Amino acid sequence: MKRITILGSTGSIGTNSLEVISRFPEQFCATYLSAGSNVKLLAEQAKRFRPKGVVIMNESLEGELRSLLAGESIEIMSGEEGLCEISRRSDTDFVIGSVVGFAGLKPTVEALKAGKDVGLANKETLVVGGEIITSLVEEHGCKMLPVDSEHSAIFQCLVGEAPEFVGKIILTASGGPFRTWEKSRFEQITVADALNHPNWKMGSKITIDSATMMNKGLEVIEAKWLFNLDYDRIDVVVHPQSIVHSMVEFKDGSVKAQLGVPDMKIPIQYALTYPERFYADYERLDWRNISKLDFETPDTEKFRCLALAYEAGRKGGSYPAVLNAANEVAVELFLKEKISFLNISELIDDAMQAHDGRAASSIDDLIDIDAQTRRYVYDKADAMHAV
């Protein structure tokens, strides 16, 4: 029985993870669950899956959670310390990191320090702290298994292959809802437009990231750390059908690709069962209904966030942390309709240009840079409105 902690159990990855766990009650159990502020769903999950403990990140909601779980023999914690505590406890074997954004960094660090294997869906953790995280994986002998569909695809294509035979990896991107829009129309993009993803059902932050193609940019940086490749060996192609999840090109010119219906339960299950594969009755590809698979070069003039991510990755150091913090704030402001869609990339670019490039050798350094960048972007956005 593999005992599983889910950091972010009420989000898209978390709810899909619980669905996978429910299909294999003899193999998996949910030991600890956490949520940001969705206290009602967390309580429902706790009553259904009977974990040992739950964490609500929003400390002001702890009282409500206690009321909802009154009479239940479930430990209740709150805040970042609660999240870190369930990440390192000895009575869990595997941690699924699906907390959105920078908030996922510290609990992932705690899980790795405690020698836990991690299924990583929180790409920001590697974007911000790639060098620190990969060092911890090596130091503590942990496995870090990708849960993102694209990185899971690359991981699967690399099974049985020697690293020296890899030429490059090719991450596929749906292109989002604005793939066919002219740049001149981008000024008119509304929040509702941007949340209307053509292929995947995801949380609001990652859906906006997909619309700007920042999601793919973050995945490029994540791939650099997961697969130890330079940026000139990480390509992105737009694939509107989201059937080919990613590819690996080898030195002899041959290419391996991993295909499947766009269903996050499949890569989640693979991370949980690796190196085995369990039967599951998920939807299968119907080859009779696939008339063609399209591939395009991404337009980085329209989608500047992808180019900014490559720039931050190549500069290295603390630039990816700045990229991530600026993006998180810009997306938050866009979702609140305080800035326009085009302002997202503008604010990220401004923050990167303003950054002094100082090194970040510890988690505390990264926290300081993250906080400074967030203040800068909030101030810059306020100045936009003042004009």
Curated annotation (Swiss-Prot):
> Where, if anywhere, are coiled coils annotated?
none
> What keyword terms does UniProt attach to this protein?
Isoprene biosynthesis, Manganese, Metal-binding, NADP, Oxidoreductase
Q: In which pathway does it act?
A: Isoprenoid biosynthesis; isopentenyl diphosphate biosynthesis via DXP pathway; isopentenyl diphosphate from 1-deoxy-D-xylulose 5-phosphate: step 1/6
Report a single Gene Ontology molecular function: manganese ion binding
Cofactor or coenzyme needed? Mg(2+); Mn(2+)
The record's annotation in InterPro entries points to: DXP_reductoisomerase, DXP_reductoisomerase_C, DXP_reductoisomerase_N, DXPR_C, DXPR_C_sf, NAD(P)-bd_dom_sf
Catalytic activity annotated for this protein? 2-C-methyl-D-erythritol 4-phosphate + NADP(+) = 1-deoxy-D-xylulose 5-phosphate + NADPH + H(+)
Q: Where does 1-deoxy-D-xylulose 5-phosphate bind?
A: 123, 149-150, 174, 197, 210, 215-216, 219
Q: Does the keyword NADP apply?
A: yes
Highest taxon, organism lineage: Bacteria
**Which positions bind NADPH?**
10-13, 36, 38, 122, 124, 203
Q: Which GO terms describe its biological process?
A: isopentenyl diphosphate biosynthetic process, methylerythritol 4-phosphate pathway involved in terpenoid biosynthetic process
User: Which residues are involved in binding Mn(2+)?
Assistant: 148, 150, 219
What's its EC?
1.1.1.267
Protein family (similarity comment): Belongs to the DXR family.
Biological function: Catalyzes the NADPH-dependent rearrangement and reduction of 1-deoxy-D-xylulose-5-phosphate (DXP) to 2-C-methyl-D-erythritol 4-phosphate (MEP).
Q: What is this protein called?
A: 1-deoxy-D-xylulose 5-phosphate reductoisomerase
**What gene name does this entry carry?**
dxr
